[in-house]
Design a protein with these regions (language model features):
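Long, low-complexity segments enriched in small/aliphatic residues
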Residues: 332-366, 370-374
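Short helix-capping/linker segments at secondary-structure and domain boundaries
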Residues: 314-328, 332, 368-373
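Flexible "cap/lid" loop of the alpha/beta hydrolase fold
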Residues: 237-255, 324-327, 335-348
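Gly/Pro-rich cap/lid or specificity-loop segments adjacent to the active site
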Residues: 32-305, 360-362, 366-505
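Short, mixed-charge aromatic SLiMs
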Residues: 330-343, 348-349, 383-391, 497-501
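Secretory targeting and sorting signals
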Residues: 1-31, 60, 193
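Structural motif
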Residues: 293-309, 315-319, 348-356
Length: 505
């Protein structure tokens, strides 16, 4: 996953982060000594949004290394919004994806579930190890995503070497985080979830995962299948492809989706005046990108920032208007400030926590190719088919070439013992291509898949599509899934939310 704007995914419910509180817990690891958790000491949250929602906050203390539970400890930031019904359906843990996304504010997510179905759960938001308000939080080089960086496409040997040096420098800087880097695998976070279950005094958990959070759910439910009561996985990672192949697949999908976006911009040429066909808009976009390499907009928005801004159009429909306005404002009026605002919103210059955790997890979940020649050959081959995102995505992952922590082996995902799961995906999702959801459906025989043909939005459940959200509500309320159909296709179909219509049209 690359630069998912978690803030945008949940903007409809205005979640946010810090907390106040204290204390402890931690538990059993898979094939590791037992660690008995203590209850979390709940207190007041620092976040106004969490306080307004009636949330409590605290810290969960867990082993740095579950193989040595008596050793060093780290603390996970946790929030809770309690059930308001007479009968509780237990706890619902939520992860927004990333890896590296903060989930602390997501204890308010239950309020977005229709039919009051979320009210019978205790919703648990948490920052995974190394993330956000958890302690310690990873950071390697806060200025890594500063403005006007070297161009992504390495069309000269010098540019290629510049990016390889930048990536190696970042990985080297990450070594200062010490032993935490050796314990940032998805399996570590799955064990943290098991610690959280025990600290909350629950025999089972319910789980809601988005994007990378689906993979965390897959790993947890493979390691602890009897501990899963109900599970919703929205936009599924294909566990066969973690993580090198998954990123190459993303490149092809994002190129398809940006063309869909350019077609939409052209449809409203009377509003934006950027071209009357998708091809014309695309040509103009690449022309502007080349010119920004020589004269960055406002001195800050160069070709990389330009790419990063519009990457969000491949993730979600609901930012399309703002991006088109900024595109048009720059082309026709030289107004660069809306571009900078969009970039800052997605990438938060001066804060590399998300990126540090992203690499710490993905670089150690599995072994990446150690030979740069393979990366070069594979990425150039994909670039010639899909130029929009390929080299940006490649450089986002190249710290894995020299990551200062050992890689492990990915878990073989097996959902045969899991009681049930609701899978959701839009069929043109670029960040987690739809084949991943089909594969997970195969691996979880008791699951059902809701598909949205033609939809391009990533992680879109509980965002206002009544067809999807009502089925989520029914599952959470009763445990009933859409009837599973023969074969390996979707079990239920919903229309995606319609494309936005510009106000001026």
């Amino acid at each position: 996953m690359k630069r998912t704007n978690v803030k945008k995914v949940f903007s409809a419910i205005a979640v946010a982060g810090l907390l106040a509180g204290t204390v402890a817990a931690a538990p059993v690891a898979v094939a590791a000594p037992e660690f008995t958790p203590a209850p979390i000491a709940w207190g007041s949250c620092n976040s106004p949004n969490l306080r307004k929602a009636g949330a409590e906050c605290g810290f969960l203390e867990v082993p740095l290394d579950y193989g040595n539970p008596g050793g060093a400890k780290i603390s996970l930031a946790v929030s809770r919004v309690r059930h308001t019904t007479t009968r509780s359906q237990g706890v619902m843990l939520v992860n927004p994806g990333g890896p590296g996304g903060s989930g602390l504010g997501l204890s308010v997510l239950g309020k977005a579930v229709p039919k009051h179905a979320g009210e019978s759960y205790d919703w648990i938001g948490f920052d995974p190890r190394g993330v956000g308000s958890s302690k310690p939080a990873l950071s390697c080089d806060p200025g890594y995503f500063g403005y006007n960086r070297p161009a992504y496409v390495p069309d000269t040997p010098r540019l290629e070497q510049t990016w390889l040096a930048r990536s190696k420098s970042y990985a080297t800087a990450c070594a200062k985080n010490g032993p935490l880097l050796e314990h940032m695998k998805t399996t570590d976070s799955a064990q943290d979830m098991e610690s959280l279950r025990k600290a909350l005094g629950q025999q089972q958990i319910n789980y809601y995962g988005f994007s990378y959070g689906t993979y965390l759910g897959q790993v947890y439910s493979t390691l602890y299948p009897q501990r899963v009561r109900r599970m919703v996985l929205d936009s599924n990672v294909d566990p066969r492809k973690v993580w090198y192949k998954a990123n190459l697949d993303q490149d092809l999908a994002f190129d398809r989706n940006i063309k869909i976006y350019f077609d939409w911009v052209a449809k409203y040429d009377s509003v934006y005046h950027l071209g009357s066909s998708g091809d014309a808009v695309e040509d103009l976009w690449y022309t502007e990108q080349k010119e920004l390499a020589h004269a960055p907009a406002g001195g800050v928005i160069g070709p990389d920032e330009w790419n990063d801004i519009f990457l969000q159009a491949g993730y979600y429909r609901f930012g399309w208007e703002d991006m088109a306005k900024a595109f048009s404002g720059w082309v026709h009026g030289g107004d660069w400030k809306p571009l900078k605002a969009l970039y800052d919103d997605a990438d938060s210059p001066g804060d590399d926590n998300n990126f540090a955790v992203y690499n710490a997890v993905q670089c150690t979940d599995t072994q990446w190719p150690a030979n740069w020649t393979k990366w070069r050959i594979d990425n150039w081959a994909v670039y010639h088919r899909a130029p929009f995102e390929t080299w940006s995505n490649a450089w986002y992952n190249t710290p894995c070439l020299s990551w200062p922590a050992k890689a492990g082996k990915p878990v073989t995902i097996d959902g045969r013992k899991v009681a049930g799961a609701l899978l959701i995906d839009e069929e043109l999702d670029a960040a987690t291509p739809f084949g991943g959801s089909l594969q997970v459906r195969t691996l979880y025989p008791a699951s059902s898949l809701i598909a949205e043909p033609g939809g391009t939005t990533h992680a879109d459940s509980l965002s206002g599509d009544a067809c999807v959200d009502d089925q989520v509500a029914d599952y959470l309320a009763t445990g009933k899934l859409p009837a599973r159909k023969p074969g390996n296709g979707p079990d239920a179909i919903c229309a995606p939310l319609p494309d936005p219509v510009p106000a001026q049209s």
